Amino acid sequence: MPIEASSGKMIIYQLLPRLFGNRNTTNKFYGTKEENGVGKFNDINDVALSAIKKMGVTHIWYTGVIEHALLTDYTKFGIPMDDADVVKGIAGSPYAIKDYYDVNPDLATSVPDRMQEFEQLVTRTKSNGLKVIIDFVPNHVARAYKSDTKPEGIKD
């Protein structure tokens, strides 16, 4: 049964993309994304968004989207490795932000195209009549914060 958004009130659906589209139920302690699986931006498709909208939701709060410290090796894409001694698990904590100008490469089907995939998700969400909310907590940073995608002239 849909929730009624009466008198213009927002109804927010919090969504963690790394879990949303993941159909792997292994849940191995300290497991890799290959062992435990990971959801992708593209898993949040028009069918899913339409179903969420039909529940009466007005906004989707995408959590864990900004690039955070993790232990997957993305150095071939210019993303530096994180120190295993300070990362929470292999997948990391979405609140240990490592680059406020980038998105989590685990959530992309193509790491070099991760920002475009995220932008397509935002467009898809809006096309389905929903608004987007993104977590942004400036003091929740990884111990090794260093942007590899910041705009020219911006200092870390």
Q: For the regions a protein language model found, what residue spans apply to each?
A:
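N-terminal structural segment of carbohydrate-active enzymes
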Residues: M1-K131, N139-D156
